[in-house]
Amino acid sequence: MLQKEKVLVLGLGEVGGSLYEVLVESGKFLVFALDLDINKMREAGAGIPEGRVDVMHVCIPCFNREEFVKSVLEYIEKFNPKITIINSTVPPGTTEELKEKSKHFIAHSPIRGVHKSREHMKWELRRWTKYIGGTDDNSAELASKHFRNLGLKVKVLRSSRETELA
C-alpha cells in the first residue's frame, strides 16, 4: 500500500482553511496545518507534522515581501518540503526569490474565486482551474501532480511571474 503524502498548510485563514478542508475531505493525504492563532488550529483539528513534509502550501498574507520571504524560508528549512506551493498573492518575482534563496522546488498557484465564506471558497477551489507557475519545470510538474491528485483541474503556465501577475 502506498504511503499518503504529508501535506502542510501554513495559515488557516479563509484561503488556507478552505484548502486544508478540501485536502482533508479528499482522504488522499496526511494533512497538517500551522497558524499563529491556536484557536484556528484547534477548530480545524490540525496537528503539527514531525520531520519532512512532501508538500507545503503557503497561505499567509504578504504585507511585506522581505518578511514574507524570511518567514517562508524558515518554514522550508524546518519542514524540508519536496515542493512548496505559494497560494498567497505576492509581488512578481517573490516565488523566484524563494527558489534562489532556498534551492528547493517552488511554484506559485493563485487562489481564484470570490472570498465570501469558507464553504464558498471550497466550492471555488474545486470549480476553477488551478493555474500553476513553476520556478522551473520540475517545480511545475510536482505542483500540478499534487493538484491533479487532489482532483482539481490544472493548467501549467510559463512561469511563476505569470501567475503572480494573475
Segments and roles (model prediction):
Residues 161-166:
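Segments forming oxygen-rich coordination pockets for charged ligands
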Residues 4-5, 55, 82, 128:
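Nucleotide donor/acceptor-binding cores
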